[in-house]
Amino acid sequence: MDIEDKSSKMHCMKGKHVAIICGVVIAVGLILGLGLGLGLKPEACNPPEDNGLLSTKPPTTSTPNVTNPSGSSVFCSAKNDENGAWTNFRLPNYVQPVHYDLDLTPEMEAEVYTGMVNISIRLEEQTTRHLWLHLRETKITEMPQLRTSSGQVIEIKRCFGYEPQEYVVIEAEEDLRPGNYFLSMKFKGYLNGSLVGFYSTTYGENGKTKYIAATDHEPTDARKSFPCFDEPNKKATYTISITHEHDYEAISNMPVEKTISLDNKWTKTIFKKSVPMSTYLVAWAVHQFKYEERISSRGIPLRVYAQPQQINTTIYAANVTKVVFDYFENYFNMNYSLPKLDKIAIPDFGTGAMENWGLITYRETNLLYDSQESAASNKQRVAAVVAHELVHQWFGNIVTMDWWDDLWLNEGFASFFEFMGVNAKEEKWQMLDQILIDDLLPVLKDDSLVSSHPITVNVSSPDEITSVFDGISYSKGASILRMLEDWISPDHFRAGCQKYLTDHYFKNAKTDDFWKAMEEVSGKPVREVMDTWTRQMGYPVLKVDLNSTVTQQRFLLDPKADPSKPSSQFSYKWNIPVKWKEGNTSSITFYNKSELAGITIMQPSDLPPDSFLKVNKDHVGFYRVNYEPQVWRTLADIMMKDHQNFNLTDRAGFIDDAFALARAGLLKYADALNLTRYLQNETEYIPWQRAVVAVSYIGQMVEDDKALYPKFQRYFGSLVKPIASELKWENDEDHIKSLLRTTVLEFACNMDDPEALGNASLLFKNWTSGISLDVNLRLLVYRFGMQNSGDEQAWNYMFEKYRTATLAQEKEKLLYGLASVKNITLLNRFLNCIKNTTLIRSQDVFTVLRYISFNSYGKTMAWDWVRLNWEYLVKRYTLNDRNLGRLISRISGTFNTELQLWQMENFFERYPDAGAGEASRKQALETTKSNIEWLKQYRDDVATWLENSEQPNFV
């Protein structure tokens, strides 16, 4: 009896949902058994013989005597002592670190490291006998030492770990009065078993296993690497030294001051003293990589490090770095503040990239680009992530948010400016418009859920801090900055950014500090307006009536949700700069939240009678717009006659708004679907990309409906056919056209277009025969070729290609192909591979599970595997891992049955501790309930419209 079966009777008796659940549990169990082999011996992953690329582990080597701890004793053991202020989550204000001398010695092959830190501390105002700072997992190996600024030793009475707040507490024998002190601590940590803190990973080079060790500290993992005051406003300077074997090199935030050869095996690299910085930005790496270098216009060396065999893949990132670096120095009117800037591609990296000051770390897919192996989407991803991390060298590093509740001051700004940065390098990529489909429109969906949260949100635990690294902080933050820039003007916005950076140089800041800078340069009530966007969740939908009167209400995807919950200090009313256009006239009419009757847009009197009032021109505002039904129908006719009456961002916005409004019950699906008729004439990437996303929700909901889904496929297949036939299964050098081609051919395949699927299968067959594929078609061919014609032989061939591929972007495409097979046995084998770290890196586990969940055969299998292996995942990644926290919401987005909802609630009851996934769980539940209601409310409306569309006289 499996885990689920043990509790199924109890939950059936609760009568939570529908009576038939209990009746189908046995049948479902049989189905799950087919999918996962429950009750049967699961098929092994059967990894091939080790070729030395990843798993071979050489013998342990000796450590130099310089920092080797005496013996193996552990000091400062954990105690449950709650008789002090160390029970508080936040560090006390009266203790300030001033400088860290940090010395580290990693044993690469033994996967351990030792270290010593000497912290200069300033004690302000208060007298105390206790000091505490952060430390997690890493062990103290000698009793800490405390000295006054004059060198006098202060006896330590005791030290202990307080695990609930991840502190090590030191108690002195005498009172510590205000003044300066030096705290010294020796410690030992482990490089294996994690992708956070100071950790190591391996890669293959000429059949040998190579090691690299690097750091990832944001948000609360510096404390895993070394004892520190691990809060962003505890800025200090650092002098870092690393002792390593001769055949390794070390890099850190600052340039090398000097290197010292200790003996015939060990070298000590000492780095220059840093500027004041937060703990989460402290970084170093020990490696055997090579680099590509560019020099900025001011003479700053810009290096990109990668494995020696991949050094040619760093050229594009190096070129982007130089252009974007120079662009931001000019835009912000502020020089980059360090003497050098390095970037390094880590073979196994838990996040996309990390903006460490002077040493930016990346997942390989986000830094390395090969023109012979990488697609246009990969190229754009590299450019965007490089630009994003460069923004942080100003927003985040020079000026850092005071606390994590203002994370958006880092991530929202980087997400906004990255589009400007890429645009400076690639002017033909429509990047200033692509923010619409990459950030604004996707996050409108997230922020329409009751389980959303404000941009500025209280956080009081590492899990809560981790959880706010989400679309609200990043994409909503970027979107409201775009709206602000448009309202106060680009020149004022730029001047405000420059003032903010200057006023808080090397310091910490809060959201109000940014509003203040913007108010001073623009003369507008920025704080009064923008607080309504940052201090309450959600956004409005503006209703435009036939008299051009505009009213607002909170937009919620669930029409049954209470729009007043949870409570908001602004009662879910917003101050809105409403941008509009009619004819050749464009303007902004301000909508104050106190205007309860709404506002009226005053249009010019000389407009032509057939002009259309477009509210939210360029979709620059963070809100949706709803018109009267007859206006939507008029709009559909205008778009059919000449869709270029509206620019491509407006066309994308119309489609996205219409389908969101229909899903929320504010517009009939007939009117939303009616708007899509014009797509047969659409030739631009941005509108097509958003149209596919908008209508695909319907497809996902009715995919198992044998009567309705074919009609859905026929209708939308007919719309995509013209552009798919025009673009063909061949490629050219045009970047935007490549993105368009991938989008429409993928949609054509999903609509079961015979020609598209035939081409995918033919190219797939050619590929399995050794014929190379165009880089921009590979993902499509791998997915749909495997889906429609892949057998075990083809799957094994692809798996071998994955195993031997060296470029991470190609490996990721092959993972998607492997996950697309319509064979339960092979999918089960693939799931079993997840636990084999030789075959699937830790960074890729959640990617594999998501890809399998996209497969109609694999959706249930991925969900079942996660539930059965949850304890394994928690042990491997911890509940603080943001990717684990989001996993369930990412694989359950299309769940739409009472059984799936029951399974989810059952699972959450069994494992109530969500860690960083608390908000994600709420989102998953809300989305599943919404999907169930959608089928009840709108399935028949969609069916009626699609049936009518097949009639000969349909117009």
Swiss-Prot record:
Output the superkingdom of the source species.
Answer: Eukaryota
The residues exposed to the Extracellular compartment are 39-955
Instruction: Give me the residues that bind Zn(2+), please.
Output: H388, H392, E411
Region of interest called Disordered, as start-end residue ranges on this chain: 49-69
What is the membrane topology noted in the UniProt record heading this document?
Single-pass type II membrane protein
Q: Function of this protein?
A: Venom protein that cleaves N-terminal acidic residues from peptides with high potency in presence of calcium. It may have several roles in venom including alteration of blood pressure by cleaving circulating angiotensin-2, general degradation of host tissue, increase of permeability to other venom components, and/or processing of other toxins in the venom.
Instruction: From the Swiss-Prot or TrEMBL record, give the protein name.
Output: Aminopeptidase A
